[in-house]
Amino acid sequence: MNVKKPVILAILDGWGIEEAGVGNAVANADQKFVKEMMGMYPWVKAHASGEWVGLPEGQMGNSEVGHIHLGAGRINMESLAKLNHEVKVDGFLTNEVLVDTFKYVKEHNSALHLMGLFSDGGVHSHMNHMISMYKAAVKFGLTNIKFDLITDGRDTAPKVAEQYINQLLQVIKDNNNIGEIASISGRYFAMDRDKRFERSAAAYITMTERKVDQPKFTDPIEYVKAAYENGLDDEMIVPAYNASVVDSELKANDAMIFTNFRPDRAIQMASIMTNNNYPAWNDEAFKDVEFIGDKIRFVSTMKYADSVTSQFIAYPPTPLTNTLGEYISSLGLKQLRIAETEKIAHVTFFFDGGNDYFKNGLAKPEEISLPHASIDLISSPKVATYDLKPEMSAVEITDKLLEEVKKDEFDLIVLNFANCDMVGHTGNNDATVKGVKVLDEQLKRIHDEFVLKHNGVMVITADHGNAEIMIDETGGPNKKHTTSLVPIIVTDKTIELSDFDPAIAKVAPTILDIMGLEIPKEMTQPSMIIKK
């Protein structure tokens, strides 16, 4: 089968649209080529947040949800919305895996540990879910409950953990003082996803051991305040255990529930907790560290990865079918996914709705087994934070992409540029401006080769906003995602795009339309191309 035109879907992760002004790194980057394209090609401003991507109304978009909807061609009720519903109906008290876990703790006279990102960011988790699980455990009759809190500062304002922890302490007080905060760790450590095992080790050891030389506290609020005084945001709070809590560490016969619902930043820690064959256990950072996974019951809220060897998943997956990638493969067409390390799972696992991974039992979410599909993985730079290298690996991605384009082998190429999101999350406005400028240059390189020389079409869009709002309402740095609209640019002067309810869930059907292919019935969103 031949396509009418090959397509590159270029996902500018975190590139939103807002009025120009101080703190708008996208507008202030003097993106000459993007402006040129917007004057030359059809484009629309599209929704990438809230109900348009299966989230609660007003909830900012995120990379996982954005990539799912870019590939799905339909609006899918996301994990946040599902778990919010469970909170409303007391569903945690009827969930078989959770109830069995409560029974396990009772039978073993042990402790229930609740670990997770404790904030209202709603990207990887929501504090209300952990609180609701806690209340369910209390109703069940558990009295030994410990919280292993991961502080955010990235999908929230930089310094709000004190506020959230105070709310939790009040909840504990309202429930007869059942429960204690056992440990606190910034997400930089506990939610690393780039195999920086020394970060994971700091959080793991804090939760599983009580060594004299480890950071510790006796008052969680004072510990967070001290971190602020030392110039640390919530994200960077050094892992520490509560020395005033007897047996604060995870012990044999305890149960742990990881309350994060988004997989990518949960996989590494959950794998370390459950799988002694995971590569971290061969790393120097884990030398002489005890593996606890064979002595506890570990529960993940959602399916994270096969490397997480615990069999207990509270809410097993229901994969999407006939996503763009799966459908393209079923037609015998060739496709390529390309991204740097930080985002490879987004152009594979998330873009495919988890379908290829869950169906075919891949070892890693970032792998792909779809017929006629290939991956080019470019390493992310090894820096502490990406404002130190705002160009990230965008140039290397483009170099590799242009090599592939010149082969004329692929009908569809899906690529991710991470700069606006990953540099934007540092809160460094100047660095983010530099990152955006680099992307403008790379888009021109791709356009001039693929569109002008190979008669291809680029569909340029984003999964959510971020870099367009770098300063928050207080005048401080904004590190979190936004509810801004995002662009959808199609480099084909022969078409016209409808601006009726534009949303990123319409990207997949639009791509199929450009390629001259039938849109499968599972894609309930229409193409944006106006039929003449």
From Swiss-Prot:
Substrate binds at H124, R154, D155, R187, R193, R262, P263, D264, R265, K343. GO terms for biological process: glucose catabolic process; glycolytic process. The active site is at S63. The keyword Isomerase applies. HAMAP family: GpmI (MF_01038). Belongs to the BPG-independent phosphoglycerate mutase family. This is 2,3-bisphosphoglycerate-independent phosphoglycerate mutase.
